[in-house]
Each structure stands twice: as C-alpha cells, then as structure tokens.
Amino acid sequence: MGGVSFSLNGKAVTVPENPATRLSDVLRGGFGLTGTKIGCNAGDCGACTVLLDDAPVCSCLLAVGQVDGQAVTSIEGLHQTGAIEKLQQSFLAHGAAQCGICTPGMLVSAAHLLHSNLQPSRAEVEDALSGVLCRCTGYSKIIDAVMQAHAVQPEPLMPDAGSNVGSAIQHLDGLPKVAAELAYGADKLPAEALMLRVIRSPHHYADFKIGDKSAFLAQHPGIVAVFDATDIPGRNAFGVIPPFADQPVFAETTARYRGEAVAAIVGVPAVIDGFDENDFPISWQPHVAMLTPDVASTPDARQMHQGRPENILIKGYVACGDADTALARAAHRVTVHSTTPFIEHAYIEPEAGYAVKQDNRLIIYGSTQAAQMDRDSIAEIMGMDVDSIRVMPSACGGGFGSKLDLSFQPFVALAAWKLDRPVAICYARGESMRSSTKRHPSDIRLEVGCDTEGRISGFVFDGVFNTGAYASWGPTVANRVPVHASGPYVTPDYRASSVAVHTNAPPAGAFRGFGVPQSAVAQECAYDLLAEKLGMDRLAFRQMNALQNNMPTVTGQCFETGVGIADCLEALQPAWDAAVARVEQFNKEAEKTGSVFRKGVGVASCWYGCGNTSLPNPSTMRMGLRADGVCVLHQGAMDIGQGANTVIAQIAADALGVPVHSLSLLDGDTDLTPDCGKTSASRQTFVSGKAALLAGRALRETILRHANVSDDASIIIEKQRLQLVDAATGNMANIDLSSLPVDDYGYVFMSEETYDPPTTPLDENGQGSPYAVYGYGAQMIELTVDRGLGQVRLDKMTTAHDVGRAINPLLVEGQIEGGVAQGIGLALMEDYLPGRTENLHDYLIPTIGDIPEFEHIIVEVADAEGPYGAKGLGEHVLIPTAPAIVNAIRQAVGVLITNLPATADKIRAALQAQGTGHD
C-alpha cells in the first residue's frame, strides 16, 4: 500500500511518486496530460492551471501529496466531457488563441468562472483570468470570448473559391490549441531520452577553467557525459548573420555574460534534475563587467572580440540633403534624449526539445522561428552536410524574435550524436531569461526643426544600442534604425547614425521591430514638442508632414503606390477630435473639483519596411495535387501564433481557385517544406504570401493547360477527379487523377515558386531601396494619470493600420492587440536587469487588467508588390504604442518621461520636481 490517491478527471488514481513531487510533473509525466503547460514553476504565469475540487490552482505550486483525497480536473478532463465546448467555440470564433501556450490555463480559469456566472462582466472576467499571463493576444479577444461564451456562436466561415482572401476565417490550426492537443517543445520528449543540463556562467565577465571531467563522472553515477568546447566537431560559433557569427556553443576560456554556456552534463532525468551545480568542477576568475556602452566603448576598455576596437560591432548611417543647414534656418527646433532598457521577450513557453540520431542523420525537434536557419547552423557546428540534419519544429509557444537564434538545439544535437541516444532538454524560466536574447537598450539623441508653417526642416539623429556580448541581430538593428528614424514623414534634410556596442550583458537580438520602437519614442515625442511650439494640433502636424506616393523617403526611394500613412492619420481624425474634446472637458472639471486625476490623449505614427534590409530575402512555396484528390501546401513559414498557416493558405487557395478548407497543410519540417525564410521582420504575409500566390497560380495554370480550358475556368476537386468548368463557354472537362503518373513528391500536378522582393544595396550615405514594401500605422491612446501616485490607467486605444489588403481581418486585429500590449510593457513597466529580474514576478509584463478598450480601423492601401496588395503587419503594431502613451502622459500632466519605462515613481518624481504633484 502507499502512494497518493485522488480523483483525476473523474477517475480514481493512485500514484507512487514522492508526495513532494509537483502536481504538474505528475500530470504531465505520470499521466501524459501535457495540456497542463509549464511556463515558470513559480505560479507566475498560470499556464499550469487546473481545478482542485472545482477551484483553479497553479499545479506547479502544489505537491501531489497536497491533493490526496481531492478531485483534480485538467484541461483534458474539461475537453473530453464537453464541459467547455461552447467556450472553446467562442475562443475560436474570436481568435482568442494565437500561439496557444496560455490557452489551457485561460480555458480552465474561464470554465470555473462560467460555472457559476454564465454572463460575466468585463471586470469579472479580468478578475477570474488575472492569474494567467499571455504574451501574444493582448487579452482583449480572450475577454470577448469568455463574455460571449454563453451565446450561440456563428458557424465558422467556409468561403468559396475566390473568396478566401478577405475572409475572417478562424485559425486553421486553432482546434488543437483550444483542445490542448497541440504539442510544444516539452510535450513529446522520448520516454527513453537522457536529459541535458547546461552549466552556465554565474558571472557577467570571467575567465574559467574546467577541472577533471573523468573524476567528476566517476563521482556522479547517473551522469553519463560532460561536454564542453573541446567536443565540438565542427565550428564552435553560430550567429544569424554569417559574417558576424561569433557566439560559441560553449565558451572556451572566457564567459562574456551571465548565463553563457560553458559546459553541459547529460544523464538520467532524476539525477540531472537533482544535480547541484556547485558540484561541477570549474574555477572562475571574474573581471570587472562592462554592462553599458559608455563603459565598454572607451579606448582603454577590454576588447571583447578581435577586430572590434572599442567594442563597436557595427555602425549604421543614412543621410540626405543638408541637415545642419536646414536646422540652422528652421523657425523652431527641439531636442529629445530618450533611453530604453533591455526588454525580455517573456514568451510563456521556455525553450525545450530533443535530438535523436537516426539512420546516420540528426533529427532535432523543438520550438523555433527559423527551421532552415537552425538546420544550416547545426550542420556547421557539427561539421556535417545539411542533408544530414532534419529540423522538425514543434508548436511554438511564442517567439517574438528570440527564437530566431539557436538556443537548446546545438546542445542536444551534440549529445545525441556523440552518445547515440535521444537527448532532451527543458529550460527553466530563469535559465531562459538569463540566456536568451533581449530587445536592444537604446540611448538616443535627436534634434529636429520645422518652418513657420510646420514642415520639417532638418533632422539629426544619433542612436547608441547595447548589443550585448555577441552580435546576434545587432547589425540588423544598427542598419534598420537610421532608415526608419524619421518616421513616415517628408524629411528632405536628414542625418541619422547608429552604433551597436558590445557589453557584458546578454546578447541583444531580434524583438518585434528591430530597434524601430526605440527610435520612435524620440521621434514622435519631438514632433509633439514642435507642434506645441507652433500652437498646432498634434495630429494636424503629422498630417502636414506625412509621406505621399511619389515622395522620396530618407533613402531616396519613391513608391508610386501603397504609401498609406496619410490614410491612417485621416482615419483617426474623428476619434481624435472627440477624444481631445473629452479630455479637455474632464480636466476642466478636475481642476474645479481638485481631483488628483488628469486625462490625456496621445498620438504616434509608424512605418516599417517588410523583410530584410537591402539583402536577399527569398521564400519558396510548393503545392501539389495527389492522385486521391488531396491538394497539399508545403508551407515552411513558421507559424508562431501570428497566423501564417492560415493567411498563407488563404492566399494560395485563391490563387489556385479552390476553397481554403480543401487544402492540406505541411508546415515547417525541413525534410518536407522548401525554405520560406525566417519568421521575422513582418515578412511572411508579404514574402511567403507572394511565393504562395505564385505557386498557386502556377499549379492552376498547369491544371488548366492539361485540360485545355480557358484561364478563367473553375476548378472543383471531387476525390480522385477534377471537374473544370469553362466560364466562357460553359464546357466541362474532367480529369481522372488516379490515371495520371506521379512525380518524386507523389503528386500528379505540382508547382514550386520562389519570390525575392526587389531591393537594392544602400550606398555610403544610406541611399537606395532597402525594402520593396513598407507598412504604415497610427495609434491614439486615451489615458488617466493619478497626480498623487504617478499611476497611469489606459482607457482606450484607437488604431489605424494600413495592411494593404486584410487577408484575414480577424487575425489582423489579433496582431494589433498583441503588439499594443507589448508596446504598453515597453512604455510603462518592462525593464530587464541581468541577475535581478530573471523571473515573471520581478520582471513585469502587462496582465489582463492593464489592457485598454480597443477600437480598430483597418486601412487598406494596396501595394502592387504584395500578394493581393497585402503588406506585413506584425512588427509595425507596437512601434507607435509607447510614444503615443508618453505623449498622452505629457498632455495629461505636463511631464515628458523619455527614460522608459515611465513608471509611477518616475512620473511622481517629475511632477514633484515641477511643483505639480498632488499629495
């Protein structure tokens, strides 16, 4: 006898585990209930929420012994009994599940609320779900889904051929997300796998020496191997930009940041889980750390990398006209100094996966944003041919740029190959935050002027970016920012320079916007200040200076069509006028009554080049029709929650001329899909979508030519037969698919097409055509400031984003809301401090209670280069958020906070300094 007995999803169970074992581990490991997700093991994220005697609890905080004699219900139990069917349908209908990693926790918490309250208020939903974090959705769709779960949901849209594009269909991969059946990196680890733990530097900067590994192994039964830099068979370096690849898999003699990998141990899971890293044989000689560019870039600073004096990784530069002369003649000039800190991506899924050696090949499974890039990098590290590597992506529980870089992959690849055993790894939350890339901290100074009418006259920008210990995406940030720092405005006299500097901080990499959100803070605050000097409406100032078709950008590029910023600003006009009037009236009344509260309204604009900056940026799509009538789309653009699987399928279906739901999707696997490039830089809808358009059209043409019918004939797939109806003549043709020969891919008809956007290199002054397409947007925030406490409450966000063509309006809104939420974090709370904020309770991200009401205006100014006129969106949407908030705070209480985040203590101190605080 013995063990712990309880009811699990309505069945009596007894488990022999140690009573101190986490309930979450018992559910996942003992019963295979992987719908219970592990995001933090600290009760911070809520992804592991289950019901204990019908009350929601974090299963990671409960020892299994604590549930003895009680009833535990997991997401699987709720799903299998149909108890949450209406709630799941509502989540799908509202687009409330993006990456899906938080969805089980949200559903369990919502189910508890709805059990006793079928029609909760917004406040009640926010309270019930306040313990579950989401980094993708911005929460608003989740709130709507819970509030409407009682209602009869409309039937899912099933558009006909030719009507796929523009339809707000549900995520094609949504059902397994709301059923908690989608497998993420930690959900399919082989039962026989050894576990790997990375030994990481506890110091920001230190030399080290590893001791006797053989003696260590002899003293630690259950640990079967130790790996370090001497074990790398190929090149001990990786990076997303090959000429700058400088990050070792294992540091060799010097660790350059806290959290850098120096070794790895591999063994049986129980031993690895319980290992005390103080027992690892390593000695350290710390150096004085250089954590900021001002320290690291001095002439006498210790050089971190050969060939990079003063620790400068790269500089960026764009100039046109004569900025100094224009500033000298300007009627008004303003200067702005802004700073932003490290920002953690804080995806709810920590890095996890495994590798296995199979038929003399390496197979790597786990979460990534760039499967083909991972494959190529692992091949170089392992000294193997790329054809010997297969990357099989799991579902990705959030990425936002950080999962573009390698993380766990080289460790498990090396160990699995050397040991000829499956090897798995699951990062703890702290390990994920210590070791992963961050948004670049910025230190920006700019001066901008205007003439008496308000037209911009001279713009000088200087940005210093902390790129951390290794290059990662530092070159991209340094080169992209000077192209964008003007904002989407006519700026004929312009000079912008940037520099990325190495420090002993975590590598700064890609994070939604590649530095542009940082530069937008200074740029948009400056335009508000100029408008004030002119006595001009702030929206009107932006409208006067907005780029139009056939006007040159700061790189000299002119677009004949598709420049949509003026349309976005015009779309905001009615809401702006009404908000300005409301704010003015409220503040007058507050002044009369002595209230501590003041309201403000702020506006900011954005533009963003879709894809790589002046570099090749190809994407390849394959489509094939099998003899059984199944049409397969080989879609390698990684869907990390943004909806690539759905949007690209909609484009391909319309190009072929079939309903989107008739397509079968193969996504991500490097053995099965062509290279669609990385999921970053708002490129997938535009670049991969265009490749899908070309592939669909090519497949259609092949079929029509085979049947000898006109180009406008309709295609109807009926199992093993194609029926084609010539629209011009009404004639019908039938193709018996089963009678046709198949190719090497197993298809009777197949197409494969590549699209690479037309760009040109930039010259020494940054002149050229860096992007084929830009997206545009503007946002307006209404907020309330407590002058006594300095606290900010966001009331309403109105957005106007030009997407060219809304391939899927539901997904467009989801991307906007998720981006705005991350912009709120940048503006008001997020600040990653190495060694201090390495968890999700010290590092704050927006919760469900921090999100304002939303109103969206989708602007469609088609671009001839995009598929059906579409542009990218994902990066753009957080760019204007922080500056709009900062501008609104200033309008509300008269203080300009540009050293972000604008926390309550900073606002209160600024108010007290100017004598306008309120006790």
Describe the role of every protein-language-model region.
Residues 395-420, 424-425, 644-652:
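Thiamine diphosphate
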Residues 50, 182, 186, 352-357, ...:
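Short beta-strand elements
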Residues 229-230, 383-388, 418-423, 452, ...:
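C-terminal catalytic domains of large/alpha subunits in multi-subunit enzymes
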Residues 95, 167, 173-179, 309-353, ...:
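Glycine-rich loop/linker segments at domain edges
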Residues 614, 618-673, 687-688:
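Catalytic phosphate/nucleotide-handling subdomain of diverse soluble enzymes
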Residues 1-160, 179:
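Signature of N-terminal electron-transfer/Fe-S-associated modules in redox systems
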Residues 150-312:
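Flexible, low-hydrophobicity surface segments
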Residues 301-382, 547-630, 839-857:
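Helix-loop-helix junctions that connect adjacent transmembrane helices in secondary transporters/permeases
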